[in-house]
A protein has these predicted regions:
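A late C-terminal transmembrane helix in Major Facilitator Superfamily
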Residues: 340-375
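Helix-to-loop junctions at the C-terminal end of transmembrane segments
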Residues: 62-74, 273-285, 372
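Helix-loop-helix hairpin linking two adjacent transmembrane segments in secondary transporters
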Residues: 139-190
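C-terminal transmembrane helical hairpin of 12-TM major facilitator-type secondary transporters
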Residues: 286-335
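Conserved MFS/SLC helix-loop-helix module at the cytosolic interface between two early adjacent transmembrane helices
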Residues: 61-99
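Cytoplasmic helix-loop-helix junction between adjacent transmembrane helices
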Residues: 105-144
Length: 413
């Protein structure tokens, strides 16, 4: 019976991983296709940029409403709607020629994809508990870098073999298969887990105890963590967005080489997920304390960059800092919502934290572009350093309060 429960939890984690990994194929294909689309002469960079902006605007705005919905209706149904929506958007996109039509379709794609992460987290928390839940959530954190690499690899093949339209059709066909997987596999997994849980609950009623203590946003220090979440979004995407341009202008390398070098970053970032999981459970046992350490390491690395490093040295700094921010993302966007299980607000908390992260990302896109033009890369490096310091203090301030109010997500649930 115990092995059956583990197998069912593993199957749940695998299906959820495939789902969230797959939506990157139907998101990043537009970015990968922009160069080929501009070469047709039908659309300009500004017009296509507005289409990309429509997606991120919709994705960010829909996070909180979709998070709340995930706590109100069936997470399984909400994910299904989101998957069907993003599948349709990708399959239809190549048939649309007008910029307005593209904006509308990609805006709807953003809303559809916003329906997936909060309810997926909610479903994992509902069907598993303790270390099982944490393991699956940490495993899902690997989908971002893995999905990014897979998306660019698939799109590179499609662009070389055919044209930009096939980037969307290939993603749409894959997503359609994922819809079928979700519809078939999840009901089976739910039934198996329910069969395992009922005997355990009847024979060992005291084993799964839930901490009923409610978390106060002000008294627990969660508000400080919300600010830290925003800052990590600014710093993480502020770096990843500008790394290729930084390398080109600082070291006068070709744009193609800068992109190839930059592709190493997502692979290295996988280590950030592991460090967050290990550090939080074994070393620091407090999300704010772990986050403060990660921000602190980032500050030291950026300060070293400001002294004038070589190309390899700069790449090491970028790799370390973005890995640290991947770790912070794991702490605050993946693990922190698990503390709100007792309140029944896991999906809502996930949506809010994800929205704040994307607000930080949007801020970074504008802020660092302006800073680079006005103050050069030296001024931008200084701004990165200030962001790291601010994030570190936002984590340090609530350490004691959060230590008192936090729940042991590894054993209590």
């Amino acid at each position: 019976m115990k092995n059956a429960g583990k197998n069912s939890a593993a199957a749940l984690g695998m299906v959820c991983w495939i789902v969230y990994f797959s939506i990157y194929l139907g998101r990043l294909n537009f970015s990968a296709s922009m160069g080929d689309m501009t070469q047709t002469g039908l659309w300009g960079k500004t017009e296509l940029g507005s289409v990309a902006a429509a997606f991120y605007l919709a994705y960010g705005l829909a996070q909180i409403p979709c998070g709340i919905l995930g706590d109100k209706i069936s997470p399984k149904k909400l994910v299904s709607i989101g998957l069907i929506g993003t599948t349709a958007a990708n399959l239809l996109f190549p048939f649309v020629d007008s910029v307005t039509g593209m904006q509308i379709l990609w805006f709807l794609n953003g809303i559809s994809q916003a329906m997936i992460w909060p309810p997926v987290v909610k479903m994992v928390i509902n069907l598993t508990y303790g270390q099982q839940s944490v393991n699956i959530i940490l495993m899902l954190s690997f989908t971002a870098p893995a999905g990014m690499l897979a998306a660019y690899l698939l799109d590179a093949v499609m662009l070389k073999a055919a044209n930009w339209r096939y980037c969307f059709w290939s993603a749409g066909i894959w997503l359609a298969a994922v819809v079928l997987l979700w519809q078939i596999a999840i009901p089976i997994i739910e039934k198996k887990i329910e069969k395992v849980q009922k005997p355990i609950q009847n024979t060992q009623p005291g084993k799964r105890q839930v901490n009923k203590k409610k978390i106060s946003l002000a008294a627990s220090g969660v508000l400080w963590m919300l600010v830290a979440t925003f800052i990590h979004g600014v710093l993480k995407d502020g770096l990843t967005t500008w790394i290729p341009t930084y390398l080109i202008e600082r070291f006068t390398i070709s744009s193609s080489l800068s992109v190839i070098i930059s592709m190493v970053i997502p692979i290295v970032n996988l280590s950030g997920v592991y460090m967050a999981g290990y550090g939080n459970r074994t070393l620091f046992k407090n999300e704010t304390k772990t986050g403060a350490v990660f921000f602190g390491v980032s500050v030291v690395c950026i300060a070293l960059m400001m002294t004038g490093l070589s190309l390899p040295g700069s790449m090491v700094v970028f790799a370390v800092v973005t890995s640290m921010m991947t770790g912070v993302n794991t702490l605050f966007v993946s693990l922190l919502p698990m503390h709100f299980r007792g309140e029944g607000k896991v999906s809502t908390a996930t949506g809010v934290l994800n929205a704040i992260t994307h607000l930080g990302s949007a801020t970074a896109s504008i802020l660092f572009g302006v800073l680079t033009e006005k103050f050069g890369w030296g001024g931008t490096e200084f701004a990165w350093c200030l962001c790291g310091i601010a994030g570190m203090f936002c984590c340090i301030i609530p350490i004691k309060r959060w230590g008192i109010n936090r729940k042991n997500i590894y054993t209590e649930y």
